[in-house]
Design a protein with these regions (language model features):
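Short, motif-level signal for alpha-helix interfacial/capping segments enriched in acidic residues
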Residues: 1-6, 81-82, 132-134
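Hydrophobic helix-and-loop "lid/oligomerization" segment in the mid-to-C-terminal part
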Residues: 2-22, 27-59, 69-77, 155-310
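Glycine-rich, phosphate-binding/catalytic loops in enzymes
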Residues: 33-35, 95-99, 117-118, 169
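Conserved beta-strand segments of alpha/beta enzyme cores
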Residues: 46-48, 98, 115, 138
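Active-site cofactor/cluster-binding pocket
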Residues: 59-114
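Short, hinge-like loop/turn segments at secondary-structure boundaries
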Residues: 64-68, 118-119, 266-267
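Solvent-exposed alpha-helices and their adjacent loops that cap or buttress functional pockets
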Residues: 71-73, 92-94, 108-109, 139-141, ...
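Short alpha-helices
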Residues: 105-170
């Protein structure tokens, strides 16, 4: 499959890189990593980005190139990274002549002409990194750093159960590139004084319900705390270390799309099937969902509690 993907990339002058909506470290990491791979391995390629790049995470990658959107005037190859199904792709892939899908989620939609899918991988960035290692294609320190950030983000610093020997193999390979590991971790995890205010707000307002802990940040709360909606979701693991809480959630108001984003985490209770029911998806113990209104929240909580009590 890897040889087929490299051959397909070589066939096209124009390539557009996609990833999922509401991007995380792995989405951006695999997207930037694939960009770097193509630019350093192939000649005369026009590489474009699809999707919203307004997230606070983008600056953490220190990308110095231009994020250009494609015009599709020439036949374009689309490469979709870290996205399980077509509905979650941030951008219109129908404008591409052919599609390559590279993903690590549970397989529900093999929408590519070529599909590199490994649901046992810790991250899409891990798949891309081992892709590089095994075929000795070229990468710069920027690309290696981006992929490493993707792995770190999706494994929560190698803490999640999907971490295995391949994860460390990929990390070791990337570590051989010249980037500042300490600076990388500081960009990803260093907090600011205002984050303490957010922590205090969440700890004073979160709700516990029969093994489920969650906090809700309305738009007025986000403005009061001076954080973005995406940043509001980042504090979900603040509730992760309490033994009595089997599942924990961050629920943030998305005024742009008139809905509520839910980040779902657990230690041992699978939540991805529940997330699928509420317009989302993801991994067994880390998923995302969307509520059309808070009226749906009791239904979601009941589904989670039923799963806990099975």
């Amino acid at each position: 499959m890897i040889e087929k993907i490299l051959k397909k990339i070589d066939e096209y002058e124009c390539i557009c890189l996609y990833r999922h909506v509401n991007p995380d470290y792995d989405a951006f990491g695999s997207q930037f990593g694939m960009y770097d791979l193509i630019q350093n391995t192939f000649e005369n390629k026009e590489v474009y980005f699809a999707g919203d790049f307004s997230s606070d995470l983008v600056a953490k990658y220190q990308f110095t190139g231009e994020i250009n959107e494609p015009n599709f005037e020439k036949p374009t190859l689309g490469i979709v990274l870290d996205t399980a199904n077509q509905e979650r792709i941030d951008g219109d892939i129908s404008l591409c002549k052919e599609i390559i899908k590279i993903d690590h989620h549970i397989v529900v939609d093999s929408y590519g002409n070529l599909n590199l899918e490994d649901s046992t991988a810790s991250s899409c960035s891990q798949i891309v990194a081992l892709f590089l290692k095994n075929k000795r294609v070229k990468l710069s320190s920027f690309g290696a750093e981006a992929l490493y950030m993707g792995i770190i983000g999706d494994t929560n610093r190698f803490m999640y159960s999907a971490t295995d020997e391949r994860t460390f193999e990929a990390a070791m390979y990337l570590y051989n590139y010249d980037f500042d590991m300490q600076a990388l971790y500081e960009r990803m995890y260093m907090k600011h004084v205002k984050d303490l205010k957010v922590n205090a707000f969440i700890l004073n307002h979160y709700i516990e319900d029969e093994g489920v802990a969650y906090y809700v940040l309305k738009d007025e709360d986000l403005k009061y705390l001076n954080i973005s909606r995406e940043r509001g979701s980042d504090f979900v693991n603040l509730l992760s270390s309490v033994d009595e809480y089997k599942v924990w959630l961050a629920i943030t108001e998305n005024t742009k799309d008139h809905n509520w984003r839910v980040s779902m985490r657990s230690r041992h209770i699978p939540v991805n099937e529940i997330a699928n029911k509420y317009r989302g998806g993801g991994h067994a113990f880390a998923s995302g969902a969307t509520l059309l209104s808070l009226d749906e929240l009791p239904l979601l909580l009941n589904d989670i509690k039923e799963r806990i009590n099975e």
